[in-house]
Amino acid sequence: MKTLKHALIVYKVGNPQAEKTAHDIQHWFYNKNVTSNLFSSDIPESQLKQSLVHTQVAIILGGDGTFLSISRNLIEKQIPVLGINFGQVGFLVEIHPENWPQMLEQLYSHKLVLQKKIVLSWSIIRHNQVIKNGFAINDVVVGRGALARVLAVDVSINKHHIGVIRSDGILVSTPLGTSGYTISAHGPLVHPDVQALTLTSVSTLFRSTPPLVLPLSTTITLTPSPHAIEPFLTVDGQEGFVLKPNDSVGIQGIKSGLLIYTTANYSYLQHLQKKGLLSSTDFNL
């Protein structure tokens, strides 16, 4: 990154501590001759995107939900993100609130590490036309409607027909996202440095298709049964779209979609241990 001149600051709406820290950060930037735009996380998407013209880095203060909702809007312009944790879990957000001054000093002096994370590009296809598309940082799910007992989804990988899977839904995830819904659905936990996508069926009626780890270059097409009752596409557990009969969802991976600043000593496996996703019992061998 060139000399930092323009920053974006977004704090979790309704969190007074995050709001106060956001204003402190804006003052810190002012003393460094860095201009900054400051918003709460409920800013309209169109207004947020208008503010990105000169943005070189985004500081997001909140939990994983705030991080996901704001970061999705930064993917297209490849704006790096630094997350400060004001949430309950904070799996995606590394920095503790008390450490923000040291982290910004490291950011300003180019001492943080910029990691490139895989994201998903998804599109809803209707009558051979893309009618909606976007990005996902964690995962996309084609799931059953509220009134449906089970959903039949036709699955194709690189135009090769895999078959029809009957389940509560089909979950496609990035490596970063496998630590969330994917492992809860008994899918694989994949290190984020692995160039791959995963496909997991949720509560499968007949366990005929195991969780799959697929090359990043894979194109996945999911087509719900035309008789399905309001099948639903969910993006990062935050955005939802009702699918009509004969709609298909196309999903691909993007190698360097999300740029995240981390500390030089960051360890993914250690992070998993801290969050309780990797544990062991001490005993004498």
Swiss-Prot record:
It is an enzyme of class 2 (transferase). It catalyses: NAD(+) + ATP = ADP + NADP(+) + H(+). One of its GO terms (cellular component) is cytoplasm. GO terms for biological process: NAD metabolic process; NADP biosynthetic process. This is NAD kinase. The lineage of its organism: Bacteria, Pseudomonadati, Thermodesulfobacteriota, Desulfovibrionia, Desulfovibrionales. NAD(+) binds at residues 64-65, 138-139, 149, 166, 168, 176, 179-184, 238. The active site is at D64. Signal peptide: none annotated. Involved in the regulation of the intracellular balance of NAD and NADP, and is a key enzyme in the biosynthesis of NADP. Catalyzes specifically the phosphorylation on 2'-hydroxyl of the adenosine moiety of NAD to yield NADP. It is found in: Cytoplasm. InterPro entries: ATP-NAD_kinase_N, ATP-NAD_kinase_PpnK-typ_C, NAD/diacylglycerol_kinase_sf, NADK. Its cofactor is a divalent metal cation. Coiled coil: none annotated. Its main location: cytoplasm. One of its GO terms (molecular function) is NAD+ kinase activity.
